[in-house]
Amino acid sequence: MTRIRQVSRPDLHPAAETIFQLIFGDRDPTVDPGTDTGSPGDWWPTFALVPEVFDHAVAGLALYRSSERKLDPQLRELGQTRVGWDVGSRFVFSQHCKSCRTVGISEEKIKSIPNWEESEVFNEIERAVLAYTDCLALNNGLVTDEIFQTLTKHLSDEEILELTYIVATYGMHGIISRALRLEFDADENQSLEEVEGDHQSLSQEHTEKRMEEIVNKEKSGD
């Protein structure tokens, strides 16, 4: 159970309604919880308590999925998944294990993220991204020159900034989720592992298709 109250569907601010339609259809998750990925879905009505916070968070989701991003989506997802593990958020870790599949990361690599240092499945830049993520989340941002030099060997300055911003943002989301006991972080004694559920709904293609359906529905007045 979440530690603070949630906003019911009829009381949402207008900008949130489209997002709720995308994720929940016509359901009110405070009454009928659940998402396609198997999560309760209480993150959304909790964040909706403060409309500006909700809108800011949603804008962050749109930012990392934007076609304007230079960073390889696979490197991004490795960082997002690992930072969920680092901060102990089952929600972030589980959701991004699923998201890894939508960008073509192999099951072998996904299963190796928790123990990446002992694994041989990651290449040089992937290992650097995972090491950099650990520095951001576990070492308060202190990064060795060796790790950073490996990043600069493979990534542009723009890509490094995108990686840093996105990973740090998802570290924050994991911390918030744990503090407020949202989603899969409701039980602080749970094991840190992926929760079974569909991953296709997290793909960019699925999101674009659902948004098109919602826009067409609004235009038709249904």
Could you say what each language-model-derived stretch is?
Residues V53-H56, E77, V83-E108:
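Conserved alpha-helical segments that form or flank metal/cofactor-binding pockets of metalloenzymes
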Residues D32-P33, R90-C97, E117-Y132, L161-E183:
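Short amphipathic alpha-helical segments at helix boundaries and their inter-helical linkers
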Residues L71-D72, G104-E108, S156-D157:
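Helix N-cap / loop-to-helix initiation motif
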Residues R101-S106, S177-E208:
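C-terminal end-helix/capping segment
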Residues S99-N123:
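Histidine/lysine/aspartate-rich catalytic loop segments that bind and position anionic ligands
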Residues M1-L71, E193-D222:
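Secretory/endomembrane lumenal or extracellular ectodomains immediately following the signal peptide
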Residues W44-F47, A57-L61, L78-G84, I113-P114, ...:
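Short alpha-helical scaffolding segments that buttress acidic/His motifs in well-ordered protein cores
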Residues I125-Y165:
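Acidic/histidine-rich alpha-helical segments that form the ligand environment
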